[in-house]
Amino acid sequence: EIYTLSLHDALPISSLLRKRLSGKESKRQQLAALLILVGSGLGLLASFVLSIESLTLAKNSHAVLNCDLNAAMSCSTVANHWSAAPLGFPNSFIGMMTLPVMVTIAVALLAGAKFPKWFMWGAQLGAVAGLLFAGWMFYMSYVEIGALCPWCLTLDAGMLLIFYGLTRHNVLNKIIEHRGLRRFVDQGYDTLVLASVAALVIMAILAKFGSQII
């Protein structure tokens, strides 16, 4: 006996597939928002600690900080360099002002809030600026200063997660409408880029400071 699938039979199947796809998409968006929250939390914690340490150094520039582990890992060495305060105040103060906004956005997204495109584009540009600034600070520490700050590295990791999570969320929600980027995210290449950047940074640190930190 031959059975044929009628339009009436196909509708429930189509509806089920849409629900499954919608559920999968929702989970991806929630994960992206969670990564924004984790990155913002790490960055805010690092900014808070660095702000306290900058006040300690303001009182005594020769103070030994808790994260002064050795010559290679020294917060005070980095903090006493001009690049730690190019605007006239510690860079960590910028994090204290901006990262609570990212925390709020992440919590709101996890709760199901929807923001207008202009707002999310503003957040995206902020994440790009933050990542570029973090990259510049890492370059200065790695090349110019010749020492690394553990809490600065924590802040860098947080900014990388914020940029990754926010970009992924905006692409999935069509805030950033670009077919190429959508395919890039759907195929997981953005995750590969994130892992590659993290691996390259770790290898660069080990190549230069490995003997001093291991």
Model-derived features: positions:
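Single conserved hydrophobic/aromatic residue that forms the stacking wall/gate
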Residues: E1-D9
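Membrane-interfacial, low-structure loops and terminal tails that flank and connect transmembrane helices
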Residues: I13-Q29, N173-Y189
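N-terminal signal-anchor transmembrane alpha helix
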Residues: L31-A58
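Extracytosolic (periplasmic/ER-lumenal) interhelical loops and adjacent juxtamembrane/interface segments
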Residues: L55-P90
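Membrane-interface loop-to-helix entry segments
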Residues: A79-V101, L148-L160
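Hydrophobic alpha-helical transmembrane segments
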Residues: F89-G112, A129, F133
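Membrane-interface helix caps and helix-loop-helix hairpins in membrane proteins
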Residues: F138-P150
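Juxtamembrane boundary at the C-terminal end of a transmembrane helix
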Residues: M203-I214
